Each structure stands twice: as structure tokens, then as C-alpha cells.
Amino acid sequence: MKNPSKRILAFIFAGFIGVTVRAQNLDVIGVTVLRMATTNLNGAGIRVAQPEANNGDNGSTNSWEVNPNNVAQPVVLFAYTSGLGASTSYPNSVGDWSSHADAVGNNFYGLPNGVATNVAHVDNYEGNYFFDSIISATPPPNINDPVVNQSFIFGSVPSQVTIAQQQQIDSDYDNYAAKYNTLFISGAGNSGPASGSVCPPATCYNGIGVGAYGTSASSVGPTEDNGRAKPDITAGGSPADLTSFSTPYVSGAAAVLMQAGLRGDGGDDTNSAADIRTVKALLLNGAVKPADWTNNPPSPLDPRYGAGVLNVFNSYKQLAGGQHGCIVSTTVSTGGAHPPTGAAGTVGVLSGWDFNTNTSGKLPLQFDAVNHYYFNVTNSVSNSTFTATLTLVWNRQQGQTSINDLNLFLYNCANSNLVACSTSLVDNVEYIFVPKLPQGRYDLQVWKAGGLDIVSASETYALAWEYFSELLKAAKSGPNISISWPVYPDGFILQAVTNLAPPAAWYTNNPAPVVTNNQNVVQLSATNANQFFRLWRP
């Protein structure tokens, strides 16, 4: 997050290499290919908010405002609010200009290299006013901004913020999110690499905590209060790899997905498609795993990367796969076994989502409940394997200090063996990643605990899934060789080598792919020497 010792350095980067780095970041996070494959997905119709901490520019003690000219947007797009009042003009008397706010805005909605360049409105708030007068107010007012970017922190836990204070901050944000369907996307902080360094408000249950990819400075989970998995996701940053500047990329992606959901790209149930639980599940499920990604079960996510590196194109394609309900719902005694049922139905797509409710028993009958999603994971290549990514998200309910216990299970239907599961007792995200899944029929289960101690009998959740097998093809094209692979899923790089004998020296200096008919295509000159190719996700 914002660090006074980095302020001048960030300004220099912004002035000299920021544009180039931002354009490269759009490639990495899937924005470039999304714009090639879709029409007008740019955040249109979505209102957003950007509360900012004082940056101290020009010696001001009230420096938090975006300068519209510096993000290439009109003044009419903005409203500015602080304890000194509100204004729709710029400059104004309620605050002063902030270079930090400009850098955040450029990644969020700025032209030309922001993610959501056509948002409907930006509410720019002074950070203390935003928390004191909106988030923690009684009752809190509805700002009507479904996406809120927060590139600030309250401080490190427990050295600057006590665990009790962190929990109160989390509750204030979670209550607001549950009440108004507002997605708070917050930087995790730059206190890494020590574990437990994620700072509020990125620690709240119902929001998304964002790390910075490519730096050891990014804060690392789990949370200090009860060991929850945070951050949820990462992205690169510009003008520096700090979470202040990675966070607005995720916020922009959320605005784009909400726009897509509301315009019907994910099906007729537009309210479910744009719900914050669905958007969060899709963002996490579309993330690309770094080579050293790992989690430590029962924690669902990597303590450094969360679900991985943001890729909004992958998330969009899963949204576009449509909403598909469970095949069958069953109940079992509390703590009882819940193998596949043998139901004949099948979810019709290997990439998609659902927004549903699971109801277990509390009183007078106590029982666990399971929603079953059956998939036939196959293709035309008999020996190929699949990569499965599965994400379950639900809210901490308004006014509650705890959460309902939901889990994810993946069973092989042929033998009822458990393939993988995610069973955290403290997280409201469950996550399964299986990189080499054999072909077959599988039962993906959303399980909800019953019993006397549950928060409520029913819980609404969002589920996103992706099963893919990346097929690399080669064909002769005149005097050349054409190498191709599907545009979706994104995040792969073509590598080549002339000799497979270890240690094989794979290289990546191939021509950039050209997208043709939803395929990445690379044209190479034919040679008499052996050449071997593979797809690699860095």
C-alpha cells in the first residue's frame, strides 16, 4: 500500500515507464484478449467508489483527490466528498490533488490503460470520512456503488491495529457488503514476506483482499484473528509492484464482470450473475497459478497469491458458460458419509457457474445437506488429463460474528473415491485445484453442515468451475508450420526446444500469437531439425 518512502519513486515510474508497464499488465491479466474477443466490455453502467487516504502531496494534509485530467476522464464523471463537504467540480475546496489517487485511478478506469474505462460514475472519498460516516455509521447510508476500490490500510495487526479492532473493522465492512451487495476490493498491504501481515480492510470476509505479484513486499496470510486465507488474489502493479496499484486492476475486472452479468452475458438471471458472491467466485476461479502456487489444507488458498494471478478473460469465459443448477440435492445425518448418488443427470458445460441455496437441518431435525453437480470430464484424446479449478463463495451474514460451514468435495463416480476437498472451518471461500485430473465422471458437492450451532438453516452461495484440457496442434501451412491452441483458457506461453534430452533448455522467443477463430496461432518456418513444443504457464 501507500508508503511515504516510496512516494517519489512511484512518481518517477509513473512519469517515465508507467504507460508501458500498464499496457503489459493488461496483457497479463487478460484484458487485452478480452477486448479482442468481446464487444464494449469496459465497465459501462457500473458506478464505482475510490476512497483514498491522505497522500501528503505538496505538503497538503488533505491530499486524496483524483485529478480527472490525469486519468483522461471528464470532470463530470466524479463526485468528491470529505468532512469538509461535497463537490462535483475540480479543483474544489473539499480536498487536494493526490498522485497516489491518480495512479490508482489510472489502473482502475483511466484511459487508455485502465481496466474499466467507461464506468458510469466515480465517487472519490476521503478515507477517514468514508469509514466513519458511511461504513461504520448507524445506520450506514447506501452509496449505490457496487464496486469499491480501497488502496489503503488501517495498519498492521497486531502492532498497529489490535485483533479486536481488526475484527470490528471486518464486521463493519461485512455488514455493509451483505446489506447493500457492495464488493469491497482492498489492498493487502506491503508488510511481507512475514506471514500474518495482511492488513484490514483486506481481512474482511465478504470482500476481496489483493496482493501484489512479483514482489516480496506484498503482505502474506493468514489473518491474525483466526487464520483465514488472505489475500484472495494477486495482480501486478504499476507504477510499482505494490498492492495500492494491483488492487485497482481487480476492481476494474469486477466492474467489467458486473457489466457483463447485468447485460446478460451469463444468462437470463442477471441479478445472480452480478451478485458480489458470483463476481468474487468467478474472479478467483479464473486466476492463473504461478509455478510455485500451493496451499496448506485445510486453508483453501496460497498465503502469498491467494487463488493466483488475476485473469479477467478466464473469469468472463466462465461467466459466459452460463448458470447451471445442481443435478440433485440430498441430506445425510450430521457428520455422515455423502458419496455420489448415482444420479444420471449431467451439468452440460465444463466451464460455468451457479448461484444457489443449500439448506441443512437445525431444529427439530439436524442433518447435513449436499448439492450434487455431476460432470462428464472427457474429450476426443483418450490419454489426456484435465485441470480442474472449483471455487465456492458465500457471505458472512449481516449482523453475524461467525459463518455457516460449507465445504467442497470432488468424488470420482466410478469408484466413489474422494479426489479432493476443501474443508476450512473459518473461511467463507472453498477452493479446489487439481492439475492432472483423469477423464471420467465426477460429482462436485457443495456440502453444508447442520446441527445446533449453525448460523442459519439456509445459505446462499456462488459456485464457479472450470475443467480444461489444453490441446496444442501443429499443421503444415505452405512452407511454414502452424502451431495453434485455444484462446481460452488464457495465461499460456508457447515454449520450444530442439532436444528433449535432459536438461531440456526450453525457450520462449517464438513469434507472438495471432488470434484467429478463437485460436492462438503462431507461424514458424519449417526446418530440417527436430522441434518440440509445449504450453507453459509461468
Which residues does each PLM region occupy?
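Subtilisin-like serine protease catalytic core
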Residues: 23-133, 141-148, 156-161, 178-183, ...
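Bacterial N-terminal signal peptides that target proteins for export
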Residues: 1-9
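Secreted peptidase-domain scaffold signal
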Residues: 301-404, 462-469
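C-terminal edge strands of extracellular/lumenal beta-sandwich accessory domains
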Residues: 275, 280, 371-375, 409-415, ...
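Bacterial N-terminal signal peptides
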Residues: 10-18
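Surface-exposed beta-strand/loop patches in noncatalytic accessory domains
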Residues: 401-428, 507
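Acidic glycine-/aspartate-rich tracts in secreted/extracellular proteins
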Residues: 53-58, 113, 191-192, 214-215, ...
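Short, composition-biased motifs enriched in small/polar/acidic residues
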Residues: 469-538
